[in-house]
From Swiss-Prot:
Catalytic reaction annotation: a 2'-deoxyribonucleoside 5'-diphosphate + ATP = a 2'-deoxyribonucleoside 5'-triphosphate + ADP; a ribonucleoside 5'-diphosphate + ATP = a ribonucleoside 5'-triphosphate + ADP
Chain sites annotated for binding ATP: 9, 57, 85, 91, 102, 112
Subcellular location: Cytoplasm
Pfam families linked to this entry: NDK
Protein name: Nucleoside diphosphate kinase
Source species: Acaryochloris marina (strain MBIC 11017)
GO molecular function: ATP binding; metal ion binding; nucleoside diphosphate kinase activity
Subunit organization: Homotetramer.
Record's function text: Major role in the synthesis of nucleoside triphosphates other than ATP. The ATP gamma phosphate is transferred to the NDP beta phosphate via a ping-pong mechanism, using a phosphorylated active-site intermediate.
Keyword ATP-binding: yes
């Protein structure tokens, strides 16, 4: 089954949106297999955003993600990477559709509430960066047979 990495950023945690965000993925039928509240180290932030290292906004990304607690999560399910991105909405909240997390709660691109892996390969890299294998639960909810054929 496919897995993706999501992180509720410091603005989402401070605004009390963690429960709302988790509820959206549970209601969709995805399975939460990893969850932790953490303060992100500068080293982890720089690794996570490594692809943007030469871009002018890199230091701002690192400063923001390390500015407060983050809720890191791993979700599992059929097509979860693409579906999670649809639930999140466009990077710029002002361009996000109503009904998406960013469309409903975001205003500014620099405070866009949540990160989600953009591809299966990215998800695998991000999951291994943020979680040890023993921190991920291998389980199936009883409702799985009601969601998948």
């Amino acid at each position: 089954m496919e897995r993706t990495f999501l992180a509720v950023k410091p603005d989402g945690v401070q605004r009390g949106l963690v429960g709302e965000i988790i509820s959206r993925y549970e209601a969709k039928g995805f399975t939460l297999v990893g969850l932790k509240l953490m303060v992100v180290s500068r080293e982890l932030a720089e690794q996570h955003y490594g692809e943007h290292k030469e871009k002018p906004f890199f230091s701002g990304l690192v400063d923001f993600i390390t500015s407060g607690p983050v809720v890191a999560m791993v979700w599992e399910g059929k097509g979860v990477v693409a579906a999670a991105r649809k639930i999140i909405g466009a990077t710029n909240p002002l361009g996000s559709e109503p009904g998406t997390i960013r469309g409903d709660f975001g205003i500014d691109i620099g405070r866009n509430i949540i990160h989600g892996s953009d591809a299966v390969e990215t998800a695998q890299r991000e999951i291994s960066l943020w979680f040890k294998s023993e921190e991920l639960a291998d389980w199936s909810p009883t409702l799985t047979s009601w969601i998948y054929e």
